[in-house]
UniProtKB/Swiss-Prot annotation:
The modification 2-(S-cysteinyl)pyruvic acid O-phosphothioketal is found at C115. One of its GO terms (molecular function) is UDP-N-acetylglucosamine 1-carboxyvinyltransferase activity. Cell wall formation. Adds enolpyruvyl to UDP-N-acetylglucosamine. Keywords: Cell cycle, Cell division, Cell shape, Cell wall biogenesis/degradation, Cytoplasm, Peptidoglycan synthesis, Pyruvate, Transferase. The gene is murA. CDD domains: UdpNAET (cd01555). Pfam families: EPSP_synthase (PF00275). It comes from Enterobacter sp. (strain 638). The lineage of its organism: Bacteria, Pseudomonadati, Pseudomonadota, Gammaproteobacteria, Enterobacterales. It is found in: Cytoplasm. This is UDP-N-acetylglucosamine 1-carboxyvinyltransferase.
C-alpha cells in the first residue's frame, strides 16, 4: 500500500485550482443511466471512486469515454446488476438502483462497502423506492428492485435527512408517472447539482436546495452537457491547510456560497477571507488560529466532512475548542492519531475537546477514512520532523492529486509506493 512521507514544518501559501465535487459527480454519473441519448459531463475529478463508477456503468452496457469530459451513452444498457466485486469498495453504487428500476423496470445492486464510518444503511433508499411502487427483495447479498410498468409518483416524508436517499428518490421519480414530493429532503449543494443535471436532460424538478423537492415525472430524458460544481470539501481542506500554518492561499474554481458555515468558522479563527464569483482567498498573516466551537449538522450547517480538518485546527490553535459530531457515530478515529503527534484532546461522547498546543511532532500514523486521512497529511505539513501516513488509498478516493497541490503550496511531501 502507498504511503505519504511528509517533512515539516512548512508555511503553506500559494494558489490551488479546486477540482469538481466527487459528491456531485458520483450521483450525476449514476443518474446518466436515465438518459436515452449521450451525455457530456464536464469537471469530473480523477478519483478512484469515479473510476469504479465508470467501470460499473460499462459493465451495465453503458458506453463510457473520458477525454477531458466524461461521455456517457446509456442507450444500450443490457445488464441490470451491479456486482459485489465493484460495489464492495464504494457505497455510492446503491445510486444505480433508482435509475435502473425507473427506466428498465428492474435492477439489482450488491450491498455496498466504502468508508468505515458508522451506520449508513440502505434502508432509506429502499423505503423511498417502495413508496414509488417498486417491489424490493434482499437476496444473496443483493438489493433487488422491480416494477411492472412505470413507477408511480408519491408523497414521501423522510424520517431523517439523507443525502443518499434523496438522490435515489429524486432520480427515480424523474421517470415515474405523476408527481412526487420529497419532504425533509437533504439540501446539500450536491443535491442541487444533481437536480440541475437532471433538469438539463429534460426532468421537471423544483425546490432543490430546500427541504421539499417536487418532481413531475416525464416519459423520457434526453442528452445534454453539464458541468459539475466545484468541490466545497476540497476547498475547505486547502483553506484549513493555510489557516493552520499561518499561511496564505487563493483557491480558484471555487464556489464560495456553498461554504458559508466553514468560512464563518475560519473568520472566527482569525483568518482574513475574501471571496469573488469563483475564488476564495485566505490570509493568516503568519498568526496562529484561535480555537473555535463547531457542531456538525446537515447543510446549510457545518459539514461533517470538514470535522476532522477543524479538529486539527483546534489542536494547534490558541485556547480550547469543542467539536461535536451529530451526523456519524465513530467519526473521531483521527483523534488518537493526532494525539500521537502531540495533540491534546479528550473525547466525551460525541464531542472532542481540543486543547491547543504550539507545535505537533512527526510520527507514523494511519489513515482510517477519507477526511481523517486528509487531516493527518495536513498535520504532517505543520509538524516538526517526518510524518508517515499509511493507508492513503482512502485519500485517493476523494482528493485529486493532493500531493501535487500541496507541493505547489510549499509542502515537502512524497508518495512512497507500496509493495
Amino acid at each position: 500500500m502507498d504511503k505519504f512521507r511528509v517533512q515539516g514544518p512548512t508555511r503553506l501559501q500559494g494558489e490551488v485550482t479546486i477540482s469538481g465535487a466527487k459528491n456531485a459527480a458520483l450521483p450525476i454519473l449514476f443518474a446518466a443511466l436515465l438518459a436515452e441519448e449521450p451525455v457530456e459531463i464536464q469537471n469530473v475529478p480523477k478519483l478512484k471512486d469515479i473510476d469504479t463508477t465508470m467501470k460499473l456503468l460499462t459493465q451495465l452496457g453503458t458506453k463510457v469515454e473520458r477525454n477531458g469530459s466524461v461521455w456517457i451513452d446509456a442507450s444500450k444498457v443490457n445488464n441490470f446488476s451491479a456486482p459485489y466485486d465493484l460495489v464492495k469498495t464504494m457505497r455510492a453504487s446503491i445510486w444505480a438502483l433508482g435509475p435502473l428500476v425507473a427506466r428498465f423496470g428492474q435492477g439489482q445492486v450488491s450491498l455496498p462497502g466504502g468508508c468505515a464510518i458508522g451506520a449508513r444503511p440502505v434502508d432509506l433508499h429502499i423505503f423511498g423506492l417502495e413508496k414509488l411502487g417498486a417491489d424490493i427483495k434482499l437476496e444473496e447479498g443483493y438489493v433487488k428492485a422491480s416494477v411492472n410498468g412505470r413507477l408511480k409518483g408519491a408523497h414521501i416524508v423522510m424520517d431523517k435527512v439523507s443525502v443518499g436517499a434523496t438522490v435515489t428518490i429524486m432520480s427515480a421519480a424523474t421517470l415515474a408517472e405523476g408527481t412526487t414530493v420529497i419532504e425533509n429532503a437533504a439540501r446539500e449543494p450536491e443535491i442541487v447539482d444533481t437536480a440541475n443535471f437532471l433538469v438539463a436532460l429534460g426532468a421537471k424538478i423544483t425546490g432543490q436546495g430546500t427541504d421539499r423537492i417536487t418532481i413531475e415525472g416525464v416519459e423520457r430524458l434526453g442528452g445534454g452537457v453539464y458541468r459539475v460544481l466545484p468541490d466545497r470539501i476540497e476547498t475547505g481542506t486547502f483553506l484549513v491547510a493555510a489557516a493552520i500554518s499561518g499561511g496564505k492561499i487563493l483557491c480558484r474554481n471555487a464556489q464560495p456560497d456553498t461554504l458559508d458555515a466553514v468560512l464563518a468558522k475560519l473568520r472566527d479563527a482569525g483568518a482574513d477571507i475574501e471571496t469573488g464569483e469563483d475564488w476564495i482567498s485566505l490570509d493568516m498573516h503568519g498568526k496562529r488560529p484561535k480555537a473555535v466551537n463547531v457542531r456538525t449538522a446537515p447543510h446549510p450547517a457545518f459539514p461533517t466532512d470538514m470535522q476532522a480538518q477543524f479538529t486539527l485546527l483546534n489542536l494547534v490553535a490558541e485556547g480550547t475548542g469543542f467539536i461535536t459530531e451529530t451526523i456519524f457515530e465513530n467519526r473521531f478515529m483521527h483523534v488518537p492519531e493526532l494525539i500521537r503527534m502531540g495533540g491534546r484532546a479528550e473525547i466525551e461522547s460525541n464531542t472532542v475537546i481540543c486543547h491547543g498546543v504550539e507545535t505537533l511532532s512527526g510520527a507514523q500514523v494511519m489513515a482510517t477514512d477519507l477526511r481523517a486521512s486528509a487531516s493527518l497529511v495536513l498535520a504532517g505539513c505543520i509538524a516538526e520532523g517526518t510524518t508517515i501516513v499509511d493507508r492513503i488509498y482512502h485519500i485517493d478516493r476523494g482528493y485529486e492529486c493532493i500531493e501535487d497541490k500541496l507541493r505547489a503550496l510549499g509542502a515537502n511531501i512524497e508518495r512512497v509506493k507500496g509493495e
